[in-house]
Swiss-Prot record:
Residues 63-291 form the Ras-GAP domain. This is Neurofibromin-A. SMART domains: RasGAP (SM00323). CDD domains: SEC14.
Amino acid sequence: MDVDKQMLQWRKRAWLNSNQLYGELTDIIIKDTGFTSSFANLIDNSEVDSFSKNIVNIFTTANKTLPLIKDLIYNEFNTKVLAEGEGSILRGNSIVNKIEGAYVRLIGANYLRFVLSDLVTKVVLDSDLKLEIDPRKLNDYYEDKIEFEKKVAEVELRDNQKSLHNIAQQFLDRITDPSVVVEMPREIRAIADYTAESALRYAPESLAPLVGGFIMLRFFSPAIVTPEYSKLLSSEVAPSKRAKRNLVLLAKVLQNASNGVLFGGKEEFMTCMNDFIIGNKEKMSAYFNLICKDPLNQNNKWSDLEGVKSATTTTTILTPTNTTTSSNGSGGTTWAKPIVGGSKWLATTPSGNTPSPAISNASSAHNGKSNNTTNNNNNNNNNNNNNNNNNNNNNNNSNKTTTTATTISSNSWDVYIKNVQIQDLFDLHRIFDSYKEKIVNKIINTNNNNANNANNNNTNNINNKTAIRVIEILKELGPSPKTKTERKKKETDAAEEPTTSLQNGASMGSAFDECTHMLERSRFLFQGPNDKNDRSVFYLIVNRVKPEVFDNVNPLIAHIFKVMDICVNSPYTLVVDMSWAHISNDLKKAIFTHLPKLAEIFSRKYKKNIDKIFIVHPSAYTRAVIYFMSAFTSRKLKRKIHDIYNWKDLSQYIDIENIALPETSKDFITKSYRVVKVNSKGKRQERLIKFTSNSLLNIDPKTHRIQNEKRINEIDEITSRLGSIEINMKLSGESKKSGSILGTKIGFLSINNNNNNNNDDSNGNHDINESNSRKYICNHELERDHILQDIFETGFKMGLQSKSTKSLPTEYKVIKVNNVGKHQERIFKLTIDSLLNLDQQRIKSENSFAGIEEVILDPHDDDIVWLKFKSEPSRRKIICTVKGEGKLLLEVLTDAINKYQTTIDIQEGALKLDAEEGFL
């Protein structure tokens, strides 16, 4: 029977048990780094970046990234030296390079600032500093001069060469200073040591280029080139075009000094710095020797970082060949006196994460019968591997260093899984699901074919058991809820026929016109009626900005000039509408690539004359973009930015009838999905879908009434198809069987069943009498994926909550006291990101958790809570009608706001990393 590969099907177990299944999947890849490194080598180049960030986030939360990197480095040398030669090791965008880079940027951020901040700031602030040594770029470099006479240019070049030499020496002296090296995170030093150990054994002539390439290319150089994203500069300091070029030249010199490669070839103009490289060769050798030493453990290097007990650690000792000595000339095994204490600059967890206890390798019970079996087998296989390694020194290093059979106590595991970000799990699920056929063909089948090889038999057994269990977990989970992969810009077909220059000109002209028309039709930027002070008002609708807007920057610039240029000679207002905005990876990349260019192109009047910037319905993306733009704007401009959490608050500045926001933005409800619901009779109804911590709300966007609420555990099955925008759900129908319960307070919206069944849905039937199936038609495939992900995330968090001793309600009956003392009965209902204020089933107002400034319990009455919204001048008095629920409301709101803020911080941090990588 043929399998329909286009069909997507999920059963209730997938999301209700996602906590357990995702937990076991991450448990497997963390404890069996041999399998993980084997899988990593199956990843296509298109997935390398995503998988690297994903795996670093998951492993770092468990403090287990280092053993994986060790395996990957050893495997890189084992497989490539003989097959492809020394020149292929750790080159390009390999998985080991990407994981190394992501990891050291994560844990070394504070250390980078400690080492480089003062020097980089000095370079950026020195407006007279001239380091350009490329004769072809002198005219561009000196923006205030038109041209140079040859004689003057030669003098300038000599002066610049001398300055570049001096500044580069200052940087190198600072980086290699032993008192500075002491503060380097030991994790970074360990990676350098793994690289050096492998180089000594397999490629001794490449030791300096490999270690230098790691420490400079992956760590220091990116920070020097993009200091605004590495926080080497304060927020009010922005590098000029000249300063950026100076930093690039410095990074080039430092990079070549670190790997000992002399300039020449395509960069002939840099050969004047070869004396610098030669003169610092001994300094760099001493530096490499120093950073590759563990200051705490002489005999069991890095064992504590790898999660291995020192008493049982087997240390790999490599004897240098006759032609290889240590960098200080005294031999590779010479050690300095151990330095007590670790680096105070180490950052061990992603932004917003609480550090998890290290996952222990000690033997302990682990959840799941299959896991216990696997762990026991893995322990036996590990012992066999150790024996084989002791008896056969020629075995692969990866066998020695593979971390298997990591059993985890339930307490530490619960803490760990709570700190893993759900999007990382979705990405992990998507990537493993995409490569499940390769897991079968390349790992399971290959190991079976090699089963007769005695040297590999034990390792094969471990990898096979792990791989088989991964396939079983993927089957239980079903497809990843993140099915949509965003399309990359299509490359030009090499087979296309060449066009003549005349055709090219016509094509370029028509392409420009087509882009211009596309920009005009999208109406992502337009002018609205003036504000109350008769100032021009422009609207930027972020939801309408697509990645293709940036495909050709010239039409974009022309369009912005056309819309704004006439009016920006005098003060004006900019309204940035973030309603319904989703920033895709393609759009993020485009924004981070082109915004700096646009900031440089537009004249000073655009910045000077802007009076106010209103951010309507702000989000994590807003904060990240504002942070990103801070490098190109002034502190004065940032003071002009105002967050608007309710679009009607714009009426303080613009007459309400003149607010030109789209109607969909005025209907905006935080993280909702505007869909079409099709009932069993085929009737189509517009709906907003919104999630609470345990249910799905169906909201009529016209009346703002909650038509019904479906618990996540009432959804039995979900189906869709690849490329489809439809979601089909089968429901258990429990709500129909328990209609009487819905009138009671059980944490779900109390809906009376006394409606007249003769009325249709628009007259108040509220979707009560529907069949046990429903269909949603989304606007696009990505939106469908987001709904699926929210269902999985809700189920995941319900699984975490079920382990908690206390489950807080999400619905509260209250009396809201308005400004004039009037009492109003209301229901407060918490969604995943907002507080709904309900009059029966009608949503009177919604406040994002981001818009709540403070929550305070009344000191004299535990049933009174005071709420302060950022959009309102004073606190609101809230009286809980059920005795004792005041403290619960305070606790649940505080917890929800903190979790939401943590999520925002993590998203913002990820966007900042994207911005940094966009310029590497």
